[in-house]
Amino acid sequence: MESYIQNLFAERIGGKKFGKEDVIYKFEKIKRAKQEAMKRHPDMELIDMGVGEPDEMADPEVIRVLCEEAKKWENRGYADNGIQELKDAVPPYMEKVYGVKDIDPVNEVIHSIGSKPALAYITSAFINPGDVCLMTVPGYPVTATHTKWYGGEVYNLPLLEENDFLPDLESIPEDIKKRAKILYLNYPNNPTGAQATKKFYKEVVDFAFENEVIVVQDAAYGALVYDGKPLSFLSVKDAKEVGVEIHSFSKAFNMTGWRLAFLVGNELIIKAFATVKDNFDSGQFIPIQKAGIYCLQHPEITERVRQKYERRLRKMVKILNEVGFKARMPGGTFYLYVKSPTKANGIEFKTAEDFSQYLIKEKLISTVPWDDAGHYLRLAACFVAKDENGNPTTEEKYEDMVLEEFKRRLEGMDLEFE
């Protein structure tokens, strides 16, 4: 007999059909394919370039600060909307790394338990039924999901190679612009690796004023750039009048599981965010915030991380070009974004997802496919390399061993592209 609870689920998560849908989503397919492939080839190591998670632990000094602060009686309690010391550390960091000045640490900065809830809370603060959120695709879906949950609509802006993977704001219909409230951006961009330009950000500011929308720029990979200095949306004149930027510690400081981020920018948006946040969480553990302060005071940690990814990405580009792909260095992030072949070894593939499944099952190479705006594969440079004892390591000779095997498996596939 079916439980009455099955009839009580909210429509936003599927209503009465919750848990009964037989649709298997992309990442679940990847997970299942990896498990199947490893069973079929028990003596073959999986090369996982799909996971977008740093392969290293946080810097030893950051861990030391966490441990020391966790022992202090005064750090045991609720943090609510964050400790002021963390907020005070943000303006010097933004000026040193991004050249952004005049940030008010009291009213223009707030912390978040990672960037995912930050995106959810902002949506909660602004979206009513019928409102529109402008979303770039492919991309991180959290803002879109929550927009729909609140009865809003999502208007997708495809990121195309011919436009340097920047959205075409002029293509948005007038009726959509009239109902739009949020423009979500993510640069450096996941998955394309594209970096925005000052010219583009100026266009965004003008667009926001003209159409009265707020800008949410997700800078999760902000400092991981390979062509020039990191660029903040807030470095553009009047950007602070229309939006906020979200900075995560996950990618820049190898702290994915620590769950720490901060928002910086428009005072009204920060105030609304704080109101929503007050009703959802009680703040991140204070010792983690203290460790975050150390990070912001030591941006050279990110520079070491960035150098490792640049080294790996350049090697991956070389290998991919040698075996038949057309790869180039990204502007930022730790991803390569390459066109997916339509044929390999005489086998035809209609989508990037089809080819990605083939790579996992036949070559034990995991990637993430994207078919939202063309057919592409995302390959991450945060793959795990192991030493002779099977322990994770970042020594270059061991990452070279992974990449040599990566190349060996890809060679001779007779790739064809449209």
Swiss-Prot record:
CDD domains: AAT_like. One of its GO terms (biological process) is lysine biosynthetic process via diaminopimelate, diaminopimelate-aminotransferase pathway. Its cofactor is pyridoxal 5'-phosphate. Substrate binds at residues 25, 52, 116, 140, 190. Pathway: Amino-acid biosynthesis; L-lysine biosynthesis via DAP pathway; LL-2,6-diaminopimelate from (S)-tetrahydrodipicolinate (aminotransferase route): step 1/1. Pyridoxal 5'-phosphate binds at residues 78, 115-116, 140, 190, 221, 248-250, 259. The keyword Glycoprotein does not apply. Keywords: Aminotransferase, Cytoplasm, Pyridoxal phosphate, Transferase. It catalyses: (2S,6S)-2,6-diaminopimelate + 2-oxoglutarate = (S)-2,3,4,5-tetrahydrodipicolinate + L-glutamate + H2O + H(+). Optimum temperature is 70 degrees Celsius. No activity is detected at temperatures below 45 degrees Celsius. At 85 degrees Celsius, the activity is 85% of the maximum activity. It is found in: Cytoplasm. Its EC number is 2.6.1.83. SUPFAM superfamilies: PLP-dependent transferases (SSF53383). Pfam families: Aminotran_1_2. Belongs to the class-I pyridoxal-phosphate-dependent aminotransferase family. Homodimer. NCBIfam families: PRK06290.1. Involved in the synthesis of meso-diaminopimelate (m-DAP or DL-DAP), required for both lysine and peptidoglycan biosynthesis. Catalyzes the direct conversion of tetrahydrodipicolinate to LL-diaminopimelate, a reaction that requires three enzymes in E.coli. This is LL-diaminopimelate aminotransferase. It comes from Methanocaldococcus jannaschii (strain ATCC 43067 / DSM 2661 / JAL-1 / JCM 10045 / NBRC 100440) (Methanococcus jannaschii). The lineage of its organism: Archaea, Methanobacteriati, Methanobacteriota, Methanomada group, Methanococci.
